[in-house]
From Swiss-Prot:
Topology in the lipid bilayer: Multi-pass membrane protein
Tissue: Detected in sensory neurons in the antenna.
Gene: snmp1
Pfam annotation, one family: CD36
Compartments (UniProt record): Cell membrane
Chain segments annotated as transmembrane: 12-32, 459-479
One term of GO molecular function: scavenger receptor activity
A GO CC annotation given for this chain: cytoplasm
Protein name: Sensory neuron membrane protein 1
Gene Ontology biological-process entries: sensory perception of smell
Glycosylation sites: 67, 229, 440
Source organism superkingdom: Eukaryota
Cytoplasmic topological segments: 1-11, 480-523
C-alpha cells in the first residue's frame, strides 16, 4: 500500500527535522569534541604542538623599577619614598629546545630558552634604559641576608669582604643605569687578594649564585635577568602530551627527573597543573585552571571571575594572587613551619631561587595592609596590578594573559655590620614585571575559521533544518487530513436530505381590538 502524496512529503520533512536534531545536537558536538581532542594534543602533526614549541610572536615583558628618592634618609632608618619608573618594554621570544617524545608514557621532555630585545618605542615616554636609578644594592643585601640567616657568626667577615668587593661603599644603595641592572650587568670585583674578599668570592663561585656570570680576570657580572637572556635553562621539564587523554595535555610530571620537589612541606612539593603554555579543553567555570611556575617553584590556581570576550570570541576570565599562607590550609605548606609564615601576600623565594627575596603582587595588591605603611608612593590597583587570564574554554586557549609579580627585599637591620645598623628592617619593593600575552589578529582569525565559524554555522543551520522540517511535516499532515475530511464530506456513502422550511401561518394583524379596562379591586 502506497502512502498518499501528502504523507510522503510529511515523512520526508519529518526525517529532515529528525536529522537536524540528531546531527545538530548529538553528532556534530561529538565529532567536534573528538576532533578537538586530536588537535589539542601535543602530537607532532598538530598546529598546537608547533606553537607550543615556539611561540610565533613576541610576548610583552615590561619592567617597572622603584627609584628610592630619599636614599640618604633611608640609610638612617627613614621611610622610603618611591617613584615608579617604567615600563621598560622588552619583546620576549620563547621557545622549547632539546624536545624529545616518549611514546611509552605519553610525555615530552624539553628545556626552555627565552630571548629579550629592548623596545624603546614601547617603553615609557623618554625612557632609553640609560637612566640612573637608585635602588637597594640587591647583591650586597643578598649576601648579608643569606649569611645572617644561615651563618650569622660570619657576618663580621662578610662586612670586611664587602668593603673590599664593593670598594668601601658609603651606603647600601646602588646607583646604576636601568639596562645595566636589568640585563647588561654590573661588575663585581673579585680580584682582591685580601682574605675576606677572596674567601667570599670563592664561596660565590661554588654556590652558583643566581644572576652572576664569571668574567675574565676574576670578575663577576651581576644582573637581574641577564643570565636568562638567550640562554638555555638547565632544568629538564617533563609534561604529558595528551594523546592518550587530552585532559592531561601539558601537565607537568617531573623536573630534572624528579617527580616532586623537596623545598617545601607536604603537598606544596607536588607538580600540579600544566607548564603554563597550554591548557586542557572543555574546562567548566566551576573548575580552576592550574599551572606550575618553574621560576617560582609553585602551582598557581586562578579562579573564575566573569565572562569576557576578545576579538569576538567568548572567553572566561580567571584571576589569581600570591595568597595568604598563614590562613589558607592549602598554602600553609609553603611556610617553613605551620606557625612561621610571611605576611599575607608575600612569598619567600629563598628556598626556590636561592636568593633572599619575596614575591608579591605589584604595589602590594591583596597583601597585608601593614606593608603599605612601610613605604610611600605605592597605589595598588587591581586593573593595573592584578594577575588575570582570559581563557577560551572549548579549546583551552589563553587569549589574553597578564602575569604580574613584584620582587621585594628586606632592609636587614643588624649591629654586626656598620652599613646595616640603622636600617629599618622592613620589606621594601625593588621592581615588578608584567609579562603579557595577547593573541594577534592572525591567530584569532585562524581559531575563528577552524572552530567558531563552523560551529556557529551549524548552530544556525540546525535550527533552520529542524524548524523547516517540522513545519513541512505539519503542513503535509494537515493537507492530508483536510483532503480526507473533504472526501468524506462529498462521498456517496453519506446521504444528505434537503430540508424545506415550513411556511408560517399567515395572521391578520391589521385590526387590533380595543383593550378592556381591567377590573377594579376593592381593598
Amino acid at each position: 500500500m502506497q502512502l498518499p502524496k501528502e504523507l510522503k512529503y510529511a515523512a520526508i520533512a519529518g526525517g529532515v527535522a529528525l536529522f537536524g536534531l540528531i546531527f545538530g545536537w548529538v553528532l556534530f558536538p561529538t565529532i567536534l569534541k573528538s576532533q578537538l581532542k586530536k588537535e589539542m594534543a601535543l602530537s607532532k602533526k598538530t598546529d598546537v604542538r608547533k606553537m607550543w614549541e615556539k611561540i610565533p610572536f613576541a610576548l610583552d615583558f615590561k619592567v617597572y623599577i622603584f627609584n628610592f628618592t630619599n636614599a640618604e634618609e633611608v640609610q638612617k632608618g627613614a621611610t622610603p619614598i618611591l617613584k615608579e619608573i617604567g615600563p621598560y618594554h622588552f619583546d620576549e621570544w620563547k621557545e622549547k629546545v632539546e624536545v624529545e617524545d616518549h611514546e611509552e608514557d605519553d610525555t615530552i621532555t624539553y628545556k626552555k630558552r627565552d630571548v629579550f630585545y629592548f623596545n624603546p618605542e614601547m617603553s615609557g615616554p623618554g625612557l632609553t634604559g640609560e637612566e640612573i636609578v637608585v635602588i637597594p644594592h640587591i647583591f650586597m643585601l643578598g649576601m648579608a641576608l643569606t649569611v645572617a640567616r644561615d651563618k650569622p657568626a660570619m657576618l663580621n667577615m662578610v662586612g670586611k669582604a664587602m668593603n673590599g668587593i664593593f670598594d668601601d661603599p658609603p651606603d647600601i644603595f646602588l646607583r646604576v643605569k636601568a639596562l645595566d641592572i636589568l640585563f647588561r650587568g654590573m661588575i663585581i670585583n673579585c680580584a682582591r687578594t685580601e682574605f675576606a674578599p677572596k674567601a667570599t668570592c670563592t664561596a660565590l663561585k661554588k654556590e652558583a649564585v643566581s644572576g652572576l656570570v664569571l668574567e675574565p680576570n676574576n670578575q663577576f657580572r651581576f644582573s637581574i635577568f641577564g643570565t636568562r637572556n638567550n640562554t638555555i635553562d638547565p632544568h629538564v621539564i617533563t609534561v604529558k602530551r595528551g594523546i592518550k587523554n587530552v585532559m592531561d595535555v601539558g601537565q607537568v610530571v617531573a623536573v630534572d627527573g624528579k617527580l616532586e620537589q623537596t623545598i617545601w612541606r607536604d603537598t606544596c612539593n607536588e607538580y600540579q597543573g600544566t607548564d603554563g603554555t597550554v591548557f586542557p579543553p572543555f574546562v567548566p567555570e566551576t573548575e580552576r585552571i592550574q599551572s606550575f611556575s618553574t621560576d617560582l617553584c609553585r602551582t598557581f590556581k586562578p579562579w573564575y571571575q566573569k565572562k569576557t570576550s576578545y576579538r569576538g570570541i567568548k572567553t572566561n576570565r580567571y584571576v589569581a594572587n600570591i595568597g595568604d599562607f598563614a590562613n589558607d590550609p592549602e598554602l600553609n605548606c609553603f611556610c617553613p613551619k605551620p606557625d612561621s609564615c610571611p605576611p599575607k601576600g608575600l612569598m619567600d623565594l629563598a628556598p626556590c631561587m636561592k636568593a633572599p627575596m619575596y614575591a608579591s603582587m605589584p604595589h602590594f595588591l591583596d597583601s597585608d595592609p601593614e606593608l603599605l605603611t612601610k613605604v610611600k608612593g605605592l597605589n595598588p590597583d587591581v586593573t593595573q596590578h592584578g594577575i588575570e587570564i582570559d581563557y577560551e574554554p572549548i579549546t583551552g586557549t589563553p587569549m589574553v594573559a597578564k602575569q604580574r609579580i613584584q620582587f621585594n627585599i628586606q632592609l636587614l637591620k643588624t649591629d654586626k655590620l656598620d652599613l646595616f645598623k640603622d636600617l629599618s628592617g622592613d620589606i621594601v619593593p625593588l621592581f615588578w614585571i608584567d609579562e603579557g600575552l595577547a593573541l594577534n589578529k592572525t591567530f584569532v582569525n585562524m581559531l575563528k575559521h577552524q572552530l567558531f565559524i563552523p560551529k556557529r554555522v551549524v548552530g544556525v543551520l540546525r535550527w533552520w533544518v529542524v524548524s523547516f522540517g517540522s513545519l513541512g511535516a505539519v503542513i503535509g499532515i494537515v493537507f492530508h487530513f483536510r483532503d480526507h475530511i473533504m472526501r468524506l464530506a462529498v462521498s456517496g456513502d453519506t446521504k444528505v436530505s434537503k430540508v424545506t422550511p415550513e411556511e408560517p401561518e399567515q395572521k391578520d394583524i391589521s385590526v387590533i381590538g380595543q383593550a378592556q379596562e381591567p377590573a377594579k379591586v376593592n381593598i
